[in-house]
Amino acid sequence: MGDNRNLPVTQPNSINFNVVILSIFFSGSFIGAWAFFNRFLKQYTKATEIPQNVFRKRWLFGKVTAVGDGDNFHFFHAPGGLIAGWGWLRPLPELNKSDPPISSSKVGSSVPIHRRIFDSIFGRNKTRTAYSNYFLGLPVPYKNKRNLPTISIRICGVDAPERAHFGNPAQPFSEEALIWLRHTLIGKCVWIKPLAVDQYNRCVAKVEYWTWTGWKNVSLEMVKQGLAVVYESKTSAEFDGEEDKYRFHEMAAKARRRGIWSQKQFETPGEYKRRI
């Protein structure tokens, strides 16, 4: 009996069990935090980085840093927005102010100058001229900022008039559409819903921006203003299930002869591209 007192005392197995539990807890916490980061806080800098499970299901928040055409722009992804520190802990890109603001006095209309003088003297195409002057007079507060880690966005469901490219002339209202989009989006934070990646590796997306009357769909607003047509392709068009709404507002704009529909002879962007 006396010899038993000299034997080493063994610790209960509960210590090893606690170590296992703590290891599982910390491993699970790390994996959960990593999954949360990848799902909600990871920044995407190009369309091909966006995971497939995001398309058609989730919205991404960010800032418009450049508008280069009437139906596309550059988007700086700011995942998590203000809650994730963007704008106060993590810097958002600062854009340089336009000085002076872009207006009809600085940016010429897509209508040739001799045609505009003729129209003003003889009173031809007054409706078209009025719409053109309105859009060309919209102020654009910021300049484009390039060379940033941004996603190139193609606005879904619509086609804006073609600007001058490779020596080809611009379509009427192409400059007006560009200025309206710059006036509406540049320097602002928007939500995008990725729908697809096109042949140019741009993210085709539904885009919404905030106004005093609520959130607006950029594509629908362009159609309502007569600055874009419903996208004509039957195979690659993306409407996020709202094609009927796009068609309705296009017919309404056409009936009111708004923007592009104020022309007597109108060639759609699709027809223009096929012709040239």
Curated annotation (Swiss-Prot):
Residues 58-263 form the TNase-like domain. InterPro entries: SNase_OB-fold_sf, Staphylococal_nuclease_OB-fold. The keyword Oxidoreductase does not apply. This is Probable endonuclease LCL3. GO terms for molecular function: endonuclease activity; metal ion binding. Belongs to the LCL3 family. Keywords: Calcium, Endonuclease, Hydrolase, Membrane, Metal-binding, Mitochondrion, Nuclease, Transmembrane, Transmembrane helix. It is a single-pass membrane protein.
